[in-house]
């Protein structure tokens, strides 16, 4: 069967036990499928597979038409942030724990990926967040940090401090001042992550929206809210010491009073390839253990 792809980048969770052997077997499989295989530079330095070249993100974007990610959702998120701007599609093999985005079990990767490489797959596009931190400088604001996030942007209180007070504006319209342990702005992809544990709803990845979820708010009436994803959200630090902001766990600590975190939709989208027949609801059932102990097809005991 002819390959739909030509050159695959292989990205691995190199800290995991046995990762070198796992990555070597995936690389050999891809090569046997007729693909040229390169490792991303970080993976190559960590595992040392000399038979394969090493490419950085820009080189992957230029030379590769597929990226195969072996690891958990954290590895997948990091790769997605790096490669989304280049439009390289991702296939995720789960070597982690939950694996919402890395949906191919390690034990089944050969029989699952072979037809995908030949072009038999489902393609999904995931929205990304683009965020920056602005600091007051006279009458202006200087951008001191900017990056992308696939899951969420989280503003949190300091480790030794009490609650933070955050002013939130959406599309330059004042929403409220929140006193809480923090605030999550989540994409639909991130709605099954921190936002879910903080009491937010699950959003289908096809929904054009964000979640805004307070973390342990002082007022119980402060509830999660769904926002249109063409909105720019601005969060200002009003009170609280040592607050921090995390973009998919990329952290900027020691925010100051008056700092603003601005979040909007990125122009880039993450291309994710799934096996034929994949659907979001089956993933939820499997990962969240829904329907366990329930008789199938409405049967009665």
Swiss-Prot record:
One of its GO terms (biological process) is NADP biosynthetic process. NAD(+) binds at residues 73-74, 151-152, 179, 181, 192-197, 216, 250. One of its GO terms (cellular component) is cytoplasm. It catalyses: NAD(+) + ATP = ADP + NADP(+) + H(+). The active site is at 73 (proton acceptor). It is an enzyme of class 2 (transferase). Its EC number is 2.7.1.23. Gene3D superfamilies: Probable inorganic polyphosphate/atp-NAD kinase, domain 1, Probable inorganic polyphosphate/atp-NAD kinase, domain 2. It comes from the Bacteria. Keywords: ATP-binding, Cytoplasm, Kinase, NAD, NADP, Nucleotide-binding, Transferase. It is found in: Cytoplasm. Involved in the regulation of the intracellular balance of NAD and NADP, and is a key enzyme in the biosynthesis of NADP. Catalyzes specifically the phosphorylation on 2'-hydroxyl of the adenosine moiety of NAD to yield NADP. PANTHER family: NAD KINASE. Belongs to the NAD kinase family. This is NAD kinase. It comes from Methylibium petroleiphilum (strain ATCC BAA-1232 / LMG 22953 / PM1).
């Amino acid at each position: 069967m002819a390959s739909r792809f030509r050159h695959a980048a292989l990205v691995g969770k190199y800290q995991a036990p046995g990762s070198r052997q796992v990555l070597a077997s995936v690389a050999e499989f891809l090569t046997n499928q007729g693909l040229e295989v390169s490792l991303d530079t970080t993976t190559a330095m960590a595992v040392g597979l000399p038979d394969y070249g090493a490419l950085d993100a820009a080189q992957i974007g230029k030379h590769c038409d597929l990226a195969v990610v072996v690891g958990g959702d954290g590895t997948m998120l990091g790769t997605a942030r790096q490669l989304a701007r280049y439009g390289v599609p991702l296939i995720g093999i789960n070597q982690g724990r939950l694996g919402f985005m890395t949906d191919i079990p390690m034990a089944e990767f050969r029989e699952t990926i072979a037809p995908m490489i030949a072009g038999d797959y489902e393609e999904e596009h995931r929205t990304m967040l683009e965020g920056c931190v602005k600091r007051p400088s006279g009458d202006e604001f200087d951008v001191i940090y900017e990056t992308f996030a696939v899951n969420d942007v989280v503003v949190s209180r300091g480790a030794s401090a009490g609650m933070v007070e955050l002013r939130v504006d959406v599309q330059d319209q004042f929403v409220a001042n929140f006193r809480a342990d923090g605030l999550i702005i989540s994409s639909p992809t991130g709605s099954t992550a921190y936002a879910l544990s903080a009491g937010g709803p699950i959003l289908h990845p096809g929904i054009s929206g964000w979640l805004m979820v307070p973390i342990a708010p002082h007022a119980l009436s402060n509830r999660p809210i769904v926002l249109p994803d063409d909105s720019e959200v601005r969060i200002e630090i009003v009170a609280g010491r040592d607050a921090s902001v995390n973009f998919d766990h990329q952290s900027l600590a020691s925010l100051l009073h008056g700092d603003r975190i601005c979040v909007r939709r990125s122009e880039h989208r993450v291309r994710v390839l799934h096996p034929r027949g994949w659907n979001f609801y089956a993933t939820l059932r499997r990962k969240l253990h829904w329907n366990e102990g329930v008789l199938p097809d409405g049967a009665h005991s």
